[in-house]
């Protein structure tokens, strides 16, 4: 409720000084009675009950200790004091309206424009709700999605303000804040007979081609590094930049893939044709970080991180638990 004090330039109007705050809504009700020719019409114009309008005007008269409306006449008209109040009240309400508009405009100008970069697995899983969560903090937001190397270069080059990336070293000078650590897992065609409970990549590659993520991406590099560590790298047959291409091939039974639980949620349109299985050997994980340019306020960066962590936590307890239950115990959010 907006309240304010109104002073008057005549001594005879009130028996005592005006000490009470005047409700701006009561002023609007009073003016509506004058403008619409009665309590009932004013109530209709304001979307209130006639009783509410009558009580508002009565409170205003009590606050000022003066009659504002001549209720004997039909339609009711303002008394001399009411006419004086009406003239000043219109100016006051107009000033308040201008002030509110100015404050809203100033608030919009104070909020930043934000350019946000998201790796595909994040954009496709929590991207939209993340933007919704921070919408009140920004005046304008633009989102780029892509692979970590590209996003890192764009952050370093000043073309992005915030990125969610799986390789913080690609944006040197920006302190990373971890959002997620998740294990690599295997995805197999549901149509594959005699599916193993744990996948040995070398043996599985002897049964089906490995559908790779491109080494242009960080996830592709990480998977390739783990295959080299295992001592034998499967032959290159299929390679894609993104999860959709990888999962489409596996769903058709053309191969199998190494991926992560979040990528599995990203490619959930293929979930009915895929099975997630743990990989053999030590657990190998990837990490996802938030990196912010120096021009981004600490408060905004913290809000983005908190929102992302909350959304990722919900994904783990929901989709990931359903699609890759064996992976959940190896996942750390935040």
Cite the ranges covered by each PLM segment.
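C-terminal effector-binding regulatory domain of bacterial HTH transcription factors
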Residues: 1-20, 136, 261-273, 281-334
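Short helix-boundary/capping micro-motifs
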Residues: 31-49
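A short LG(V/I)-centered, amphipathic sequence patch enriched
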Residues: 61-80
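Alpha-helical linker/hinge and terminal dimerization helices associated
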Residues: 63-64, 85-107
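Secondary-structure junction motif
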Residues: 194-196, 209-231, 298-309, 313-324
């Amino acid at each position: 409720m907006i309240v304010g004090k109104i002073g008057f330039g005549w001594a005879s109007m009130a028996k005592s000084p005006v000490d009470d705050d005047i409700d701006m809504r009561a002023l609007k009700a009073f003016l509506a009675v004058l403008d619409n020719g009665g309590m009932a019409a004013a109530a209709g114009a304001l979307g209130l009950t006639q009783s509410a309008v009558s009580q508002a005007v009565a409170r205003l008269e009590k606050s000022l200790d003066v009659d504002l409306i001549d209720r004997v006449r039909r339609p009711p008209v303002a008394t001399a004091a009411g006419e004086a109040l009406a003239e000043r009240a219109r100016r006051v309400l107009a000033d308040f309206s201008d002030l509110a508009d100015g404050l809203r405009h100033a608030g919009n100008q104070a909020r930043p424009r934000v350019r946000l970069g998201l790796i595909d697995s994040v954009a496709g899983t929590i991207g939209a709700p993340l933007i919704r969560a921070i919408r009140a903090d920004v005046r304008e937001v633009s989102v780029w999605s892509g692979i970590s190397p590209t996003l890192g270069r764009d952050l370093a080059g000043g073309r992005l303000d915030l990125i969610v990336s799986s390789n913080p070293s690609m944006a040197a000078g920006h302190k990373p804040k971890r959002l997620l650590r998740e294990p690599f897992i295997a995805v197999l065609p549901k149509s594959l007979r005699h599916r193993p409970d744990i996948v040995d990549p070398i043996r599985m590659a002897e049964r089906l081609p490995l559908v790779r993520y491109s080494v242009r991406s960080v996830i592709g590099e990480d998977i390739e590094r783990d295959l080299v560590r295992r001592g034998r790298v499967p032959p290159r047959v299929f390679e894609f930049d993104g999860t959709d291409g990888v999962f489409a091939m596996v769903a058709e039974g053309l191969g199998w893939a190494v991926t992560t639980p979040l990528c599995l949620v990203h490619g959930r349109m293929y979930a009915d044709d895929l099975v997630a299985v743990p990989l053999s050997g030590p657990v190998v994980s990837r990490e996802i970080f938030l990196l912010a340019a120096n021009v981004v306020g600490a408060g905004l960066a913290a809000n983005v991180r908190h929102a992302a962590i909350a959304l990722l936590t919900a994904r783990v307890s929901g989709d990931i638990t359903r699609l890759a239950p064996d992976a959940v115990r190896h996942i750390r959010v935040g």
